[in-house]
């Protein structure tokens, strides 16, 4: 919202409205002063951070350069030599980058901090002094006026005349102070627009130039980077193949260390514990044993020397070896041997199961005879015996322990569970088990039921329907979820559906007593989800779906009455579930990945041919001079097809657009930029419709009206090279550092310049008469010229006239 102007005529009246308007200006001045302080503070912090960052990078480069690779072996490959020297190359590159950055940082304070501080102290500070004088003179005038009005008319005429003259003098002084203050505060209000923006513009200009020089160094770094990447990949491939061989060797060593023994060494050796029987009991002694398979000779070296007795190695000839039954001894990893030298059996204990297996393989040991395992596949089928077992378990649970707290969650004894299952599924008399025997408690029955269901050859809800059930549980639509599961239940085989109904009905009864047993449908789903459903493959993805298996069982329990009332009607089609995540139609635009658009190229004023050696074109397209400050970066309009032709699909600009040099350039993302960095080919320099390409000697000042924020150019332009990044500096050549400008560039002239067949130097071409004397003058010229333009010229492009 704009402020009303302060009229000089109001200074004489000094009305309340005038004071109120003046107060608005004072508040705005104070806000501007605070803003400048913040900019100075944050700018100083930024410059300090850049200086600290540069110092940190240089310290980092020193650390890289101080390290020297060591290696295994007596020589290095060419790739390893490249890798060993890489840190030195990195350090040199970082030093070069930071040297250029430090040159920019050294001038940053002069560009940003000092001009702002000068404006704040001199202009705003002077305005505050005017304010103090204005307030002081006003207070003195009104105080004198009050005293003057209280004078009696009976005073002498000379005294009254003298008082009138004094009041007029103070009024005149106050009026002058008011005029000076109003003039000064309005001047600061207008001049702050360029006095604040210009230093920031100059600082950003120097900052971006420094960044663009970093891009040049990146271009020089690319060939080395590619070669180093190739060396790294080759070295990695060598390492991978070597590691595979070493892993195989390590694996063989872990599984069977004797296979890696050297000639002349025993077949197997290691620590074993020997059971020694004495009159007062049994003890275990530690021995280091060696066994030779060819001679069947076992050498035992005692490790625990008894006091007063000297023990030496004992050689025994092996006759027989067998693994000790687990239930026959309270020790683990035991096996028995018989020897010719000692009568009876010698019991040995290995450190681990794997080590015992190695000893038994070396000694040709045998396994003890066991009963048939109870978990054979043919006994864990969903057959008549299985149904009988499930019904007996359910009957016992609902009769004896349905109110037991933690039912199905508390696990029973594994030995008792195995004993019950072995007795019930005994092929000789299957099902002949009395559950009401005191040997079976409620935890044993529930654990046996879960064990049977989990060890079926195929889960109750089958592998075939597993994915469909999980997919239904993943739906956000509750109606679809219930309808789909309802339909899938009736796709189960008849015996599976019968078993599922039997179990779910039982779980419903259990959940009805949840106040006593604390087993809710959710808790039962957690227990019976993995029991009734199981993925055919054991993968991480399958494990992640267990929570959806639990949801399926929970739905079956909560909607048992509806699901098992009957199959769903054929006409009833479950509603289509909505997608869990809406598909994205447009990819988000980010800094590194943008839509391809016409790129804006920046140029400055044209330069004379005889000054080419002192000019440099920066990576953002700006031609700068080492002697003179650069002019304002100016945008170019989109490229014209031909001189005198317009693009039929292009809309007319909302403001006049001056004719300019142009070339088709597209904005690229980071990946495309790297591709262009690696591309060594050059493209033909496009010809403009109104003159030579900038950088070839003569350029033309132009402007481009921006209706939206212009994309920042990513391409890097050098002298005469419009494709960018195709011109590589020689390895030995050092890039000349471009000093930041000493003052910000002048604003462009937005007037329409008629197209001419020959380019004519304008502002910035060396003719000092055409350069505006100040920023204010240039802007005045712009507004005066723009005010004469009519709306009819806005519908044409400059190229349409020719």
UniProtKB/Swiss-Prot annotation:
Q: Where is the composition biased (Basic and acidic residues)?
A: 716-732
The subcellular location is: Postsynapse; Presynapse; Cell projection, Axon; Cell projection, Dendritic spine
Q: What does this protein do?
A: Stimulates GTP hydrolysis of members of the Rho family. Its action on RHOA activity and signaling is implicated in growth and stabilization of dendritic spines, and therefore in synaptic function. Critical for the stabilization of AMPA receptors at postsynaptic sites. Critical for the regulation of synaptic vesicle endocytosis at presynaptic terminals. Required for the localization of NR1D1 to dendrites, can suppress its repressor activity and protect it from proteasomal degradation.
- Polar residues bias locations: 617-627
Task: Tell me which Gene3D superfamilies the record gives.
Answer: Arfaptin homology (AH) domain/BAR domain (1.20.1270.60), Pleckstrin-homology domain (PH domain)/Phosphotyrosine-binding domain (PTB) (2.30.29.30), Rho GTPase activation protein (1.10.555.10)
Domain named Rho-GAP: residues: 380-564
Q: Name one GO cellular component term.
A: dendritic spine
> Where does the PH domain start and stop, copy by copy?
265-368
Q: Which domain of life is it from?
A: Eukaryota
Q: Where is this region: Disordered?
A: 606-665, 681-802
InterPro entries in the record: AH/BAR_dom_sf, BAR_dom, GRAF_fam, OPHN1_BAR, PH-like_dom_sf, PH_domain, PH_GRAF, Rho_GTPase_activation_prot
Question: What's a single GO MF annotation on this record?
Answer: GTPase activator activity
Q: How does it assemble?
A: Interacts with HOMER1. Interacts with AMPA receptor complexes. Interacts with SH3GL2 (endophilin-A1). Interacts (via C-terminus) with NR1D1.
Gene designation: Ophn1
List keywords of the entry alphabetically.
Cell projection, Cytoplasm, Endocytosis, GTPase activation, Neurogenesis, Synapse
One Pfam assignment: PH
Q: Does the keyword Ribosomal protein apply?
A: no
What protein am I looking at? Oligophrenin-1
Cytoplasm found in the keyword field: yes
Q: Which GO terms describe its biological process?
A: actin cytoskeleton organization; cell junction assembly; cell morphogenesis involved in neuron differentiation; cerebellar granule cell differentiation; cerebral cortex neuron differentiation; establishment of epithelial cell apical/basal polarity; maintenance of postsynaptic specialization structure; negative regulation of proteasomal protein catabolic process
| Site residues (Arginine finger), renumbered to this chain | 409
**Cited CDD domains:** BAR-PH_GRAF_family, BAR_OPHN1, RhoGAP_Graf
């Amino acid at each position: 919202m704009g402020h009303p102007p302060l009229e000089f005529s109001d200074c004489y009246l000094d009305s309340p409205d005038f004071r109120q308007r003046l107060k608005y200006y004072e508040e705005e001045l104070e806000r501007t002063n605070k803003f400048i302080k913040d900019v100075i503070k944050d700018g100083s912090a930024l410059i300090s951070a850049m200086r600290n960052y540069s110092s940190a990078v240089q310290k980092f480069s020193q650390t890289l350069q101080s390290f020297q690779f060591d290696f295994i072996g007596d020589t290095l490959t060419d790739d390893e030599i490249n890798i060993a020297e890489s840190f030195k190359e990195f350090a040199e590159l970082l030093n070069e980058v930071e040297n250029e950055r430090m040159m920019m940082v050294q001038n940053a304070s002069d560009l940003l901090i000092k001009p702002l501080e000068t404006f704040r102290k001199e202009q705003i500070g002077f305005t505050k002094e005017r304010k103090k004088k204005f307030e002081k003179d006003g207070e003195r005038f009104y105080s004198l006026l009050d005293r003057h009005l209280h004078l009696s008319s009976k005073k002498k005429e000379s005294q009254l005349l003298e008082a009138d003259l004094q009041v007029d003098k103070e009024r005149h002084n106050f009026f002058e102070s008011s005029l000076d203050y109003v003039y000064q505060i309005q001047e600061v209000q207008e001049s702050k627009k360029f006095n604040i923006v210009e230093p920031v513009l100059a600082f950003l200009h120097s900052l971006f130039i420094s960044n663009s020089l970093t891009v040049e160094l990146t271009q020089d770094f690319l060939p080395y980077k590619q070669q180093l990447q190739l060396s790294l990949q080759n070295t990695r491939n060598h390492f991978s193949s070597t590691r595979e061989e070493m892993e195989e060797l390590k694996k063989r060593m872990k599984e069977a260390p004797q296979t890696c023994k050297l000639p002349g060494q025993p077949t197997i050796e290691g620590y074993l514990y020997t059971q020694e029987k004495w009159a007062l009991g049994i003890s275990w002694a530690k021995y280091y044993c060696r066994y030779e398979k060819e001679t069947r000779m076992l050498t035992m070296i005692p490790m625990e020397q008894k006091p007063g007795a000297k023990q030496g190695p004992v050689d025994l000839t092996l006759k027989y070896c067998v693994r000790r039954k687990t239930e026959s001894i309270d020790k683990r990893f035991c096996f028995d041997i018989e020897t010719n030298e000692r009568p009876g059996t010698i019991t040995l204990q290995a450190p681990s199961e794997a080590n015992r297996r190695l000893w038994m393989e070396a000694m040709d040991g045998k396994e003890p005879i066991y009963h048939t395992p109870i978990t054979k596949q043919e006994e864990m089928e969903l057959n008549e015996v299985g149904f009988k077992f499930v019904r007996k378990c359910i009957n016992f649970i609902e009769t004896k322990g349905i109110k037991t707290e933690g039912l199905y969650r508390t696990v029973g004894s594994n030995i008792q569970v195995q004993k019950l299952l072995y007795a019930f599924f005994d092929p000789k008399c299957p099902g002949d088990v009395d559950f009401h025997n005191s040997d079976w408690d409620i935890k044993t029955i529930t654990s046996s039921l879960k064990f049977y269901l989990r060890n079926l050859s195929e889960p109750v809800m089958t592998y075939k329907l597993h994915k469909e059930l999980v997919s239904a549980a993943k739906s956000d639509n509750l109606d679809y979820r219930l309808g789909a599961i309802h339909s899938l239940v009736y796709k189960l085989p008849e015996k599976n559906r019968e078993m599922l109904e039997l179990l779910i009905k039982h779980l419903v009864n259990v959940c009805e007593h949840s106040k006593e047993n604390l087993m809710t449908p959710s808790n039962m789903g957690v227990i019976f989800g993995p029991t009734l459903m199981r993925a055919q493959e054991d993968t991480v993805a399958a494990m992640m779906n267990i929570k959806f298996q639990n949801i399926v069982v929970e739905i079956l329990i909560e909607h048992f009455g509806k699901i098992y009332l009957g199959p769903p009607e054929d006409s009833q089609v479950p509603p289509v579930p909505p997608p869990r995540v809406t598909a994205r139609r447009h990819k988000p635009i980010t800094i590194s990945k943008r839509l391809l658009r016409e790129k804006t190229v920046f140029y400055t004023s044209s330069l004379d041919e005889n000054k080419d050696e002192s000019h440099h074109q920066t990576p953002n397209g700006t031609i700068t001079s080492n002697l003179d400050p650069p002019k304002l970066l100016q945008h170019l309009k989109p490229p014209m097809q031909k001189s005198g032709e317009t693009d039929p699909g292009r809309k007319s600009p909302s403001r006049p657009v001056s004719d300019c040099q142009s070339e088709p350039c597209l904005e690229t993302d980071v990946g495309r930029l790297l591709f262009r960095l690696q591309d060594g080919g050059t493209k033909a320099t496009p010809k403009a419709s109104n003159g030579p390409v900038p950088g070839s000697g003569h350029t033309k000042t132009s402007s481009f009206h921006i209706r939206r924020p212009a994309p920042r150019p990513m391409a890097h332009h050098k002298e005469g090279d419009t494709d960018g990044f195709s011109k590589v500096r020689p390895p030995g050549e050092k890039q000349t550092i471009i000093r930041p400008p000493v003052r910000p560039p002048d604003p462009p002239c937005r007037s329409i310049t008629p197209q001419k067949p020959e380019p004519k130097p304008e502002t910035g071409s060396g003719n000092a008469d055409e350069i505006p004397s100040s920023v204010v003058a240039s802007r005045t010229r712009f507004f005066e010229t723009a005010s004469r333009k009519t709306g009819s010229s806005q519908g044409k492009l400059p190229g349409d006239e020719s």
